[in-house]
């Protein structure tokens, strides 16, 4: 009984944490960096691979996004988290998920988030797209979180690599990397100009 009670209280804490995060998401808007990445689709085929669990890229207008660590606005089965039949997109009025809210297989709903120690199922999809890239862009990441940091190993030899970050980032790679030492918004704007003036468009 004690063990069941502890598990239940742990789920309550987790649900409460993610419920609050969902509410906060309603108060946040995409920034200019998100919008500029979406605008790149006018001239290029763009795939965004993100470690963020928010939906700001979608709201900014990007159409092809791979969420490595899951999505805050979705819930899934606690028994079979990656089964697409039980993954549900929540409307804002459904953001409050409680103990007793069940997935289609009868198990407790849980956030569609990759928790510590769980596998990252979308990494294979990300690798497939990285292997086709003509241009690979790293924005605002320390390159220390795996498996995402390992994507650099799958960039084709003839692809250009850009790093956008206002702070110095130690990237462990023998590949030449074009560094744009600016924030995301200014950096993506500069990147777009560079790409449009070369033969990528």
Predicted regions and their residues:
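Cys/His-rich short segments
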Residues: 56-124, 128
């Amino acid at each position: 009984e004690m063990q069941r009670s502890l598990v239940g209280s742990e789920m309550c804490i987790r649900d409460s944490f993610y419920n609050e995060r969902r509410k906060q998401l309603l108060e946040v808007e995409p920034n200019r960096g998100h919008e500029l990445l979406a605008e790149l689709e006018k001239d290029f085929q763009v795939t965004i691979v993100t470690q963020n669990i928010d939906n700001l890229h979608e709201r900014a207008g990007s159409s092809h996004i791979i969420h490595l660590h899951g999505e805050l606005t979705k819930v899934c089965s606690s028994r079979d988290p990656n089964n697409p039949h039980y993954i549900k997109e929540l409307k804002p009025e459904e953001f409050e998920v409680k103990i007793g809210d069940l997935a289609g297989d009868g198990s407790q709903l849980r956030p569609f988030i990759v928790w510590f120690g769980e596998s990252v199922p979308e990494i294979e999809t990300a690798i497939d797209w990285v292997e086709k890239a003509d241009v690979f862009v790293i924005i605002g990441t320390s390159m220390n979180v795996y498996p995402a940091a390992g994507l650099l190993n799958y960039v084709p030899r003839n692809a250009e690599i850009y790093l956008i970050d206002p702070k110095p980032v130690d990237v462990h790679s023998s590949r030449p990397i074009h560094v744009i030492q600016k924030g995301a918004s200014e950096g993506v704007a500069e990147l777009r100009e560079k790409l449009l003036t070369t033969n990528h468009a």
